[in-house]
Amino acid sequence: MNKLILGIYLYRIFSRAYFYLPFLLIYFLIQDYSIIQLEILMASYGIAAFLFSLYKEKCFKICNLKDSNKLVVSEIFKIIGLLLLLYQNQYLILVVAQILLGLSYSMMAGVDTAIIKRNITNEKYVQNKSNSYMFLSLLISGIIGSYLYGINIKWPIIMTGIFSILTIIIIRCTLVENRELNLIGETKGKIKKFLPEEKFWILHYSFLRALILGFFIGFIPINIYNDLKLNNLQFISVLTCYTVMGFVSSRYLTKYLNYKFVSEICLVIFLIIYTYQSFIAVTISMIFLGISSGLNRPQTINKLSSSSNLRVMLNYAETLYFIFNIAFLLMGGYLYTIGTIQYLILFISLLIFIYLIIIFYFTRREQHENKN
């Protein structure tokens, strides 16, 4: 294993060690904010990430940053955001913290993927393996975070900050690229139009990811904490089930379930089971949500990796993801406020129906173009 591949693995493990993430909504919830205030906090992350994604290539060109330096700057923003999260009962400061964390995410989105594509021969293998390491990192950090949360609610945030510092050290020591490769990689791809097949996978990635992560991070913790009133052990069991299945599907099931609409089918099954609103039903439903989430990214990258347009497509997909995620959190938050979790599930079902109609259009268009 060469130094760069080791660096990619370590970077994706350490940078995705979000010890605090499963408890972020609960952390805000115990500060007595309303559901709308909570969803605005969550959406401010996406708004900041979305707005920066529109201009980040221009900003990076002006600053003349190498990809490894972009990742370092991203981690610095994350550390500052995490420090601000420690200020409890200061709503505006928490909003600023979420904005900085959103900027951090937007800066790093797609950069490590581009490094892999330009510098590593067996890129699909490294992508898939490192994706599974990301889920494993989320799983282990979530379990450790639950233990830390039981001791002190701020410790998971502090531990995430420590891992961000370690991530910067890893980047500096291992992610060394040829300067010319960075510049060449960014000038390609913007000329080509997206093919119908590429549009399908871009929409598949951005829309499903927005629904899955929006529901998992933005609503499930409130539902199982406030409505179902699960204890801490049950709470962790539900969240761990999702992460374990995300890891298994990303690492092992991708090669066997590499078909269109598998993620969509799993998401629909999740919604059906989740409506029963019991600990057992919710836990079982997390199996299907985890599979859907775990397949989403590696499957999309595998399908798009042969294109020289990969970086542009991933940036575009991330921008769409932010738009969908913001809209879903705000509209879903309103529905949850005026009704129950059933309102939200019906809303998601309607969104999936509209999404499938659009996907059907892209599929038919692709078939028509292939005939011609």
What annotation goes with each model-predicted range?
Residues 1-50, 198-239, 318:
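Helix-loop boundary and gating motifs at the non-cytosolic
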